[in-house]
Structures are given as structure tokens and as C-alpha cells.
């Protein structure tokens, strides 16, 4: 199968870049910069960005094998700086960093910029800059600060850009990638997610064989798709385990049990572990520690259930790639943002072998795979819900009282969005309980209650997100209902932070 090889230098956007390539119908493979490289069936190479400076002692390098492969190369951000230094150009720090939206001007013709306006906005994230291009290379664009934003040597098939075309904030970013992949590399695009499904089912069969597996089923999109995909591969050798850790939304246990038995016919066991999780989290306020504890307890519960199944050796998890990236597992040079319960919280002495069939996919791709597998819309288009659940939506220590309050608040918010037709318009919405009490008025008396924060974001893959512009009249209705129906809440606020710089979840 013809493919584009993406070499990862530690960018948070590396797998997003791979996804953009797949969106163009071309298979992409991501490898680390120091992995052994096979160029079989490779038709083009992309060097990702990364957090390093090319002048650091241990800075990731590029091999002569790649530069001499006579394949089209696209260097992005760090990849551009690396090529410049390697081929005799100059990279410097001049005290002018460029972060976020930046305007660039095309200064010379380039196949990379075919049918693209001469001036457009891009997404930058760099301190180092190329101040001199290698011999026989030409500058093709400059930023409004007169900084080199792209250069190339068409005869050598080497193209370099300082900005990130894979991020949606870059105008015409997909067109630039398309120009490279189709126009320069000559790939037409015939790979589909159907290919992924077929290959993954075969891979799961080959991995698990006639052994048994259990799945960490939550009722969310990711674990649901992982369950059906695995069930297609090994049939009744899959047992679904639904753990009620006490941090689920209102009525969620009953809804999940009903949905999976009605729609999917899975062999489903519900484990009530509420007291176990709460006791482990008593006195814990640090969000990283919460995630680690919850991740470990999940595994222990699954191990105990697996021991009841003779021959059970595998644990299926619905980890997707945004989870992996945020846990700093995507590249050796990636900076850690926060751990994910499916990734960063796994105990080292786990007795089960982990299988993560969706770990290469983003949320929208997971939904597309679910559609291919025939899952109902009400499962596929539920808003994302974190594995630790409401535990990371209560700031500070968790107890029964706070959980009850948050469940009521969240239920009001979500139901109001559904009633007003806004639930399907936003990517994710939820409530957060802030354990700070503020003054309010109840009747003729002063009162003190908690603050509830509402969070709603628009996104596609979860790597970047904008806060949702929910109409004020709907927010007004939600706020009024919460303060009237949940007596412990005296104040409601709406989170208008985008990702980046914020993350979607508060913890």
C-alpha cells in the first residue's frame, strides 16, 4: 500500500497531521525520529514539528538516508529548521517568537502554494527561525515580520514551511497538504476507513486468537466502538465489563445497561464499585493523582472480573489518539500536558495484556468507524465523557454531597441543550463544580453556595477547540433552572476559554 511517512520529532500535532493525510484518502504511517526506517511503498516524507532547538546538544537529527532517498520531503516547523541547518542554512533566535495566528505573504511561485491566495493566515509556534536558506534553495514566503516562513528546492523535491498546515487555524492548510501529497508526491487517494476496519478486525483476531478478552465498557463512543470492533473479531470470547465507579452522570447506569442489551446484545456485567473508588479518593485533591488512582482501580476491578473467566488474558480499551498525545506517549520529545486514565494511569504490574484497537484514530474517525459497524446514532453522537467521569469535574476533594450536586447541575444543562436543539450543535458540553462558596440571596435571606461552571466547546478531533457561542437566552434559562432547582448552587459561570491555551476538561 502506497503511503506517506510522517517522522515524529515530538510535536503535539503529529498524529493530527497523520489524520489530515488520511482525510485526503492516503494511508499515513507515523514513526519516531530515531526508529529504524523502511521506505518500502513510501511515496513522500513529512518531518513534524517539535519542542527542541536544532542547536541543543541532544536535538533530534535527520538521517542522510532520508535526505538521499530521492523522495519528496516536507519539513514542518522544527522539520524546516532541521533541514535548513543540515543543508548549510542558518537558524537563529532573535528574540522575536511567533505563536498563534500569523499572516504570511507568498513571495515566489511554488507547487506547494498552487491555487492559494498570495496572503493568508497561518498557525505558528516557534522561537527559532531560519535566517538564511541553504544554497540552491529559494524563499517562497515571508511573515508580516519579514521572517522566512517557507523555502524550497523544487529540483531536489524538498519543501519547508515554518507554520502548521495540519491545524485548522491555518487557512488553506489542507490545500497545502493536498498540493504536496497529490501534486508533488503523485498520490491520488484511495485509502478509506473501511480498510482500517477490515485490517483491524484481522489484527485483533491474530492477536487474541481463541483466548478470551474483557472490555472496559463505559457506554461512551470510544468504548462502544472498540467493543463492537472486537466482538466482530472474536465473537462471544469478549465479555463487556461496566464499572459503576460512582462518577457517572444521572441515570447513566440504567441507560447504558438498557442500550447495550437492546442494541448490541453484548454479554454485559455491571460491577458496583462506588464505595471502593470513593474510599481511595478520600482526601485527594491533586488532579493527576485522581487520574492515577482511578486508572489503577479500574485495572484492578477488571483483573478481578477477568479471573472469573477461564482463559481471559486481554483487556480491550477504548483509548484514542488524543488521549495518547495528551499523556505524552506519542513521541519521546513531546511535553506532557496531563495523563489520561487509559494511558498514564496503568499500573506497572498489570496482569492483563492491553489491546487498544482505536489508539490511532481521532474522535470523528471513531464515529465514522462506528457508522461502518452499524452502531446507532444515539451512541455514536453522545458527547465525549472522560473515563474518570465526574471525579475530574469536581475541583478538589470528592464526596457524595458534591457528586449529587454536580449530577443535578449537569443533568439540567444537558437536558436544556437537548430541549433547545443545541446538544447536537456543540461537540461537548458539561458542568464543573467549583468548591468555593459565594454569597447569594434565597428569598429574603443571604445564603452561601457553590459555584457551577458550564463548559461547551466546538471541535472536530479534540486537539483544538473553541468555546461554543450558545445563545444568551439559553444560558440564562440554564442558570435560572440550576439556581432554582439546586439549592446548594448560588452562582453559575460560563467558561469562554479555547484549547489551546486551556484544555477541554478542567482537570
UniProtKB/Swiss-Prot annotation:
Residue ranges constituting the Glutamine amidotransferase type-1 domain according to the UniProt record: 3-190
A family per Pfam: NAD_synthase
Domain GMPS ATP-PPase: 191-382
Pathway info: Purine metabolism; GMP biosynthesis; GMP from XMP (L-Gln route): step 1/1
Lineage: superkingdom: Bacteria
GO MF terms held by the record: ATP binding; GMP synthase activity
KW Nucleotide-binding (keyword) present: yes
Enzyme class: ligase
Binding-site positions, ATP: 218-224
Residues at the catalytic site: 77 (nucleophile), 164, 166
CDD domains with a match to the protein in the record: GATase1_GMP_Synthase, GMP_synthase_C
UniProt function note: Catalyzes the synthesis of GMP from XMP.
NCBIfam families listed in its UniProt record: guaA_Cterm (TIGR00884), guaA_Nterm (TIGR00888), PRK00074.1 (NF000848)
HAMAP family in UniProt: GMP_synthase
Entry protein name: GMP synthase [glutamine-hydrolyzing]
Gene source species: Petrotoga mobilis (strain DSM 10674 / SJ95)
Amino acid at each position: 500500500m502506497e503511503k506517506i511517512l510522517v517522522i515524529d520529532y515530538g510535536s503535539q500535532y503529529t498524529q493530527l497531521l497523520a489524520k489530515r493525510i488520511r482525510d485526503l484518502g492516503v494511508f499515513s504511517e507515523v514513526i519516531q525520529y530515531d526508529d529504524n526506517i523502511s521506505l518500502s511503498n513510501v511515496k513522500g516524507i513529512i518531518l513534524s514539528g517539535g519542542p527542541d532547538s536544532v542547536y541543543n546538544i541532544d536535538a533530534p537529527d535527520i538521517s542522510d538516508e532520508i535526505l538521499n532517498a530521492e523522495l519528496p520531503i516536507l519539513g514542518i516547523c522544527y522539520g524546516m529548521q532541521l533541514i535548513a541547518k543540515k543543508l548549510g542554512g542558518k537558524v537563529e533566535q532573535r528574540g522575536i517568537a511567533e505563536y498563534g495566528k500569523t499572516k504570511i505573504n507568498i513571495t515566489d511561485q511554488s507547487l506547494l502554494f498552487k491555487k492559494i491566495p498570495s496572503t493568508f493566515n497561518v498557525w505558528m509556534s516557534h522561537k527559532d527561525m531560519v535566517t538564511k536558506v541553504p544554497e540552491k534553495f529559494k524563499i517562497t514566503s515571508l511573515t508580516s515580520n519579514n521572517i522566512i516562513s517557507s523555502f524550497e528546492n523544487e529540483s531536489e523535491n524538498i519543501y519547508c514551511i515554518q507554520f502548521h498546515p495540519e491545524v485548522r487555524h491555518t487557512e488553506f492548510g489542507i490545500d497545502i497538504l493536498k498540493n504536496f501529497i497529490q501534486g508533488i508526491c503523485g498520490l491520488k487517494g484511495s485509502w478509506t476507513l473501511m480498510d482500517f476496519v477490515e485490517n483491524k478486525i484481522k489484527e485483533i483476531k491474530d492477536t487474541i486468537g481463541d483466548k478470551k478478552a474483557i472490555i472496559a465498557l463505559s457506554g461512551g463512543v470510544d468504548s462502544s466502538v472498540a467493543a463492537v470492533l472486537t466482538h466482530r473479531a472474536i465473537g462471544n470470547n469478549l465479555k463487556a465489563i461496566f464499572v459503576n465507579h460512582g462518577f457517572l452522570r444521572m441515570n447513566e447506569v440504567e441507560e447504558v445497561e438498557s442500550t447495550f442489551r437492546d442494541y448490541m446484545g453484548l454479554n454485559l456485567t455491571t460491577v458496583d464499585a462506588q464505595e471502593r473508588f470513593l474510599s481511595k479518593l478520600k482526601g485527594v485533591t491533586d488532579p493527576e493523582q485522581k487520574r492515577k488512582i482511578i486508572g489503577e482501580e479500574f485495572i484492578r476491578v477488571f483483573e478481578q472480573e477477568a479471573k472469573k473467566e477461564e482463559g481471559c488474558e486481554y483487556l480491550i480499551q477504548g483509548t484514542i489518539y488524543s488521549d495518547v498525545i495528551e499523556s505524552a506517549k506519542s513521541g519521546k520529545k513531546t511535553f506532557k500536558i496531563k495523563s489520561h486514565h487509559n494511558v498514564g494511569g496503568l499500573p506497572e504490574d498489570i496482569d492483563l495484556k492491553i489491546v487498544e484497537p482505536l489508539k490511532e484514530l481521532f474522535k470523528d474517525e471513531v464515529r465514522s468507524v462506528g457508522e461502518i459497524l452499524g452502531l446507532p446514532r444515539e451512541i455514536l453522537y453522545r458527547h465525549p465523557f472522560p473515563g474518570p467521569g465526574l471525579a475530574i469535574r469536581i475541583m478538589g476533594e470528592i464526596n457524595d454531597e458534591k457528586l449529587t450536586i454536580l449530577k443535578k447541575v449537569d443533568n439540567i444543562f444537558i437536558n436544556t441543550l437537548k430541549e433547545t436543539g443545541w446538544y447536537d450543535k456543540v461537540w461537548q458540553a458539561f458542568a464543573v463544580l467549583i468548591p468555593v462558596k459565594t454569597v447569594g440571596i434565597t428569598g429574603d435571606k443571604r445564603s452561601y453556595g457553590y459555584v457551577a461552571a458550564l463548559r461547551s466547546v466546538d471541535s472536530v478531533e479534540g486537539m483544538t477547540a473553541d468555546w461554543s457561542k450558545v445563545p444568551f437566552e439559553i444560558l440564562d434559562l440554564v442558570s435560572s433552572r440550576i439556581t432554582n432547582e439546586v439549592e446548594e448552587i448560588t452562582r453559575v459561570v460560563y467558561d469562554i476559554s479555547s484549547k489551546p491555551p486551556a484544555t477541554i476538561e478542567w482537570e
